[in-house]
């Protein structure tokens, strides 16, 4: 099984990158993990909503037939860590790869949410997209430790 995180934009501040790298390294002990950073759609000629539409096309073009698509969106389901671990476990037994999507500043286009097998919210609070990466990767690491019965999750 492979876990990919497709995220629009880069962490230009460098603030979150050390945590992303640390949890990605830990996650790598359990599964193949890949972070794919995609460019934000931009330009002076873009109308409101056009960036989301352009990003949606780029995102959906990266989906493979074996992927279970999980879109992160404020309207999504709130899962606790154990529930997320069960979802990851189902993907493992179904021989599916997981593709998590974090949209750009405007969020995700409806086409991405509609294509998703699961729409997931990390919190009722609004999080910066770069911080959402850290939270998600840590929760994925936690999910695998739960599945393995390891003591990280308390």
From Swiss-Prot:
Organism superkingdom: Bacteria
Binding site for S-adenosyl-L-methionine: 72, 103, 122-127
Keyword rRNA processing tagged: yes
Entry EC number(s): 2.1.1.177
UniProt entry keywords in alphabetical sequence: Cytoplasm, Methyltransferase, rRNA processing, S-adenosyl-L-methionine, Transferase
Compartmental location: Cytoplasm
Pfam families, per the entry: SPOUT_MTase
One GO molecular-function entry: rRNA (pseudouridine-N3-)-methyltransferase activity
Catalyzed reactions: pseudouridine(1915) in 23S rRNA + S-adenosyl-L-methionine = N(3)-methylpseudouridine(1915) in 23S rRNA + S-adenosyl-L-homocysteine + H(+)
Gene3D superfamilies: 3.40.1280.10
InterPro entries linked to this entry: Alpha/beta_knot_MTases, RlmH-like, tRNA_m1G_MTases_N
A cellular-component GO term for this protein: cytoplasm
Similarity comment text for this entry: Belongs to the RNA methyltransferase RlmH family.
Subunit record text: Homodimer.
Free-text function comment from the UniProt entry: Specifically methylates the pseudouridine at position 1915 (m3Psi1915) in 23S rRNA.
Protein name as it appears in the record: Ribosomal RNA large subunit methyltransferase H
Source organism of this protein record: Myxococcus xanthus (strain DK1622)
């Amino acid at each position: 099984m492979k876990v990919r995180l497709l995220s629009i934009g880069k962490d230009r501040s460098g603030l979150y990158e050390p945590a992303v790298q640390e949890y990605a390294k830990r996650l790598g002990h359990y599964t193949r993990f890949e972070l794919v950073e995609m460019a934000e759609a931009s330009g002076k000629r873009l109308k409101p909503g056009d960036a989301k539409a352009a990003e949606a096309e780029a995102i959906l073009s990266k989906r493979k037939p074996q992927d279970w698509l999980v879109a992160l969106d404020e309207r999504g389901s709130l899962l606790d860590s154990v529930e997320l671990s069960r979802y990851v476990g189902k993907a493992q037994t179904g021989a599916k790869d997981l593709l998590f999507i974090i949209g750009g500043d405007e969020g995700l286009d409806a086409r991405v949410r509609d294509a998703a097998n699961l729409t997931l919210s990390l919190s009722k609070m609004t999080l910066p997209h770069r911080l959402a990466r850290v939270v998600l990767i840590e929760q994925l690491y936690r999910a695998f430790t739960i599945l393995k019965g390891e003591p990280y999750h308390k």
